Amino acid sequence: MNRKEKLNRIYLILLSLFVVMLGYGILLPTLPYYTERLALKDNLDTNLINFHIGLLTSIYPFFQLLFVVVWGKLSDKYGRKPLIVIGLIGFVVMNLLTGLATSLTMLYIARIIGGIFTSSVIPVSNAYLSDITSEKRRTKIMAWSGVAISS
């Protein structure tokens, strides 16, 4: 792989990381309003709305925690690129389901799917970046990965 091709892959991975984290971060401020609206539509007890907000906020990273090791093992077996693509497709599905949710149950399903699939994107992308960069440039590329994730 030549230098230009390698740089294009690095930029694409960094952009993917940025978009996934942007999608996660954009939803968080609207999640309480969205949850309240769906809870009231489902005629749920208003005292439980805050419980659902907390659970919907935490269920996403909880499923990321559960599945990150699974994705890591699968990426070692099947390769990095297919699992990054699968994770990004799952991320798109999660965002569509979240936007189209008409009940709290659908929102829970969307958040669980999001946690499962996005847990592949960050660690597998970092492993892929590590695979395609030289030891000399690896620290710099990993720093850029951190920037993409935290931006």
Identify the residue ranges that each predicted region occupies.
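Small-residue-rich segments within alpha-helical transmembrane domains of MFS-like 12-TM solute carriers
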Residues: 21, 25, 99, 115-123
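Cytoplasmic helix-loop-helix junction between adjacent transmembrane helices
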Residues: 110-149
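Extracellular/periplasmic helix-loop-helix junction of adjacent transmembrane segments
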Residues: 34-65
